[in-house]
């Protein structure tokens, strides 16, 4: 229902501006627990088929994961078998632990990005970015976000 509403909105807006790309944020739980598709009105296969991008909240601390890297690897395993995932699924990493209100250590965030690149995933980002405190530290992250890193 929400997907169709988004598509209808795009169609209405395209009379004023073309092309219009659509993206939608999805909870990781939708990938990890098929029953939750109904709770959240989200389906990754449906989203990948209908949207230009699906941003998946790959946020292990928000999900209370005991081992964040293992949790992320499992999320990748589950999602990358879905058709169109390699092209259209974007993993949104967390840069802040909202439970403690503290930033995720930049080296940990960087290691997640490196792990994703090693696994062949190039569509990832992070949230939030605090440019006033340089959190996460861009000198460290740019090594993982640069075009040079993508070619390695």
Where do the protein language model's features map onto the residues?
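Aromatic-lined carbohydrate-recognition surfaces of secreted/lumenal glycan-active proteins
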Residues: 1-40, 86-98, 127-129
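Substrate-binding cleft of secreted/luminal carbohydrate-active enzymes
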Residues: 45-69, 73, 78-152
């Amino acid at each position: 229902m929400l997907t169709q509403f988004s598509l209808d909105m795009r169609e209405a807006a395209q009379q004023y501006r073309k092309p219009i790309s659509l993206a939608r944020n999805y909870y990781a739980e939708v990938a990890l627990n098929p029953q939750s598709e109904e709770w959240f009105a989200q389906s990754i296969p449906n989203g990948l088929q209908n949207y230009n991008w699906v941003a998946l909240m790959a946020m292990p601390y928000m999900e209370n994961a005991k081992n964040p890297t293992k949790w992320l690897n499992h999320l990748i395993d589950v999602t990358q078998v879905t058709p169109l995932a390699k092209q259209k699924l974007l993993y949104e990493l967390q840069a802040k632990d909202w439970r403690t209100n503290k930033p995720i250590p930049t080296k940990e965030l960087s290691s997640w990005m490196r792990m994703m690149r090693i696994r062949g995933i190039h569509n990832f980002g992070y949230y939030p970015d605090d440019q006033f405190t340089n959190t996460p530290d861009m000198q460290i992250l740019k090594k993982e976000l640069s075009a040079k890193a993508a070619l390695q």
